Curated annotation (Swiss-Prot):
Signal peptide as annotated in the record: none
Alphabetical list of HAMAP family matching this protein: CitG
Organism: Escherichia coli O17:K52:H18 (strain UMN026 / ExPEC)
Annotated GO MF terms: ATP binding; triphosphoribosyl-dephospho-CoA synthase activity
Designated name of the protein: 2-(5''-triphosphoribosyl)-3'-dephosphocoenzyme-A synthase
Length: 292
């Protein structure tokens, strides 16, 4: 594959360490897509509210992206002496090249564009922290990623142009900042909510898949998911959040019998053409950070 230039500065990171984190990123993507049943999302049971993609597309996509994750880590290390605000500019060509390989692997289907952005940021943050011999925890990784994105929401969402992107339109209409806002804030939905929730359930001995499904419900209940809003408007988003919150209040996903509630939720999401892809991306980050 064609590799964009990154930096002339050398790193002291061992290839084995870089590959270890890249492998975790790949495993995170596979863990999320194979998790079943997920309301409105592609999984092992069905294609959710998507008519243009299947489980195999996500498997091919994750493999293509895995080859680029070491480059994000390496650039994070190579740019460790740069001002954090300057790092994002250098990450963009790597992200675009990674995105190109994703589209080639899926014959043009957008399976993991959001994950390229978020995992790319976290991998670059990991590279920077390792290079600087700084503490590497979920919190420091996310705060470092946030420092790369300082001012991103203002630059890319607040505009008076007549030709608005989907993200700009949702920001102006509903105040949703999407993946950019979550990254710039240091992934608070993950750090303050999803990750501690998931780890607590694991500590209680809950089956890991059930724990992840319950954590997905939590994210769906609290995330202003632009994927949902772009398909169903504010009404669709509020409905999905309310349904997820109701399931959590009833006890969430604690036993295999509770999966029937998710299957019904899935059918309703498909009928409404709603897919919480933004929450799925955050679930990928949750699992990834739980391994650090």
């Amino acid at each position: 594959m064609s590799m964009p230039a990154t930096s002339t500065k050398t790193t002291k990171l061992a290839t084995s360490l870089i590959d270890e984190y890249a492998l975790l990123g790949w495993r995170a993507m596979l863990t999320e897509v194979n998790l079943s049943p997920k309301p409105g999302l592609v999984d092992r049971i069905n294609c959710g509210a998507h008519k243009d993609m299947a489980l195999e597309d996500f498997h091919r996509s994750a493999l293509a992206i895995q080859g680029w994750l070491p480059r994000f880590i390496e650039f994070g290390a190579c740019s460790a002496e740069m001002a954090p605000e300057a790092v994002l500019h250098g990450l963009r060509p790597i992200g675009m090249a990674c995105e190109g390989d994703m589209f080639r692997a899926t014959a043009g289907v957008n399976t993991h564009k959001g994950s390229i952005f978020s995992l790319g940021l976290l991998c670059a943050a990991i590279g920077r922290l390792l290079q600087l011999n700084q503490s590497l925890t979920p919190t420091t990784v996310c705060s470092t990623a946030a420092s790369f994105c300082r001012g991103l929401t203002d630059r890319e969402l607040r505009t008076n142009n007549s030709q608005l992107t989907a993200g700009q339109r949702l920001y102006q209409q509903l105040g949703l900042t999407g993946a950019r806002g979550e990254a710039e804030a240091g992934y608070p939905l993950v750090i303050n909510h999803a990750l501690p929730h998931y780890l607590t359930l694991l500590d209680q001995g809950l089956d890991p898949e059930l724990a992840l499904l319950d954590t997905l419900l939590l994210l769906m209940a609290i995330n202003g998911d632009t994927n949902v809003a772009s398909r169903g408007g504010e009404g669709g988003l509020r409905w999905l959040q309310r349904e997820a919150q109701t399931l959590l209040q009833k006890g969430g996903i604690r036993t295999p019998a509770d999966l029937d509630y998710l299957r019904q939720f899935d059918r309703e999401c498909i009928e409404r053409n709603l897919s919480p892809g933004g929450s799925a991306d955050l679930l990928i980050l949750t699992w990834f950070l739980a391994q650090i």
